Amino acid sequence: MSTGRHLPGGARLSSFRELYGRTPACTARAPGRVNLIGEHTDYNGGFVLPTVIPQVTTVELAQRGDRIVRVCSAEVGDDRPAEYELGREARRHAWVDYVQGITWVLAQAGHTLRGADIRIESSVPLGSGLSSSAALEIALLRAWRDACRLDIADVPLALLGQRAENDFVGAPVGVMDQMACSLAEDRVALFLDTRTLEFARIPLPPGIDLVVVNSGLSHRHAGGDYMTRRRECEEAARLLDVPQLRDLPLPRLERTIGGLPETLQRRVRHVVTENQRVLDAIAAMRAGDVALLGRLFYASHASMRHDYQVSIPEIDLLVDLARQDPRVHGARLTGGGFGGSIVALVQEGAGCDVAHRVVREYDAHSGQKATVLVPPP
């Protein structure tokens, strides 16, 4: 998720030794994630179904003898480190806020840190709806955990990452991204109940290729439309006198929401039906029913487009181009929306061909430059 601040990723960065004159004491990694289905449900206490992608964020760290943190990232474009002092973290509205947020939240949780030299490199594309910020947070937390021998299990680690992004960076994200980056596995979906944090690992059905295409249009989570959607959901829950929209039953939904303003009706309808689609998707995966899973993808996209209103014409174009190919079972916007990426279920062996055909036609029709992220080059 992008918040309008630059996150590490992309450019060539000098080695740790070239930057700091020594070798790192530890190296930690965390993957990006793609959400298969269950969009904008996490901050409503609902269900999500993400899996990891091949792109990762890598953090190298060596502790210092003082309380200074120096950090270099590939995104900055030079080797001059950002610098701050532990205990004096202050929001700068820059990429280093994610690093500061992690040391701040660790201190808030009672952990003792020393200063450190840090190098960050990432192949998770920014603003693509694939959790570049969560991958960074989890990689940083893992590095600090290893370096300082902190006793933090993977679920509490994810919660610390979410708290850093919520309370320090200022992005009102749910917990899905950090949980996925901390717990998910390749070709295994993580079914997560975001209220209870209970989870189960669901293998992807055989016979499919997963395709992820980045539209080339980034999104933002620390303000604007994303924050508006969250506030609309909170207001709808208040008016309906439920703790969260997750608590509304699907039967008689239209009668339940009939007294709300039309905009809030749309938001509630998406969240409640999307929660059911997650449960239906799990049943389809366990049954190996790829056709049903694909139909759920298309239904999810239609709901995000018409009821939650987070899609944009370029994303709709990508989904429509994918739908035209008989080898595609389903496709949808993935991530927070307002740009980002689509995820598609494709007949096994056809993923690369389908992805590159969609990109060529998209580039020709939109004037934008899309990128195939999965399958990786």
Task: Identify the role of each PLM range.
Residues 2-28, 33, 38, 46-47, ...:
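Gly/Ser-rich oxyanion-binding loop with an adjacent helix/lid
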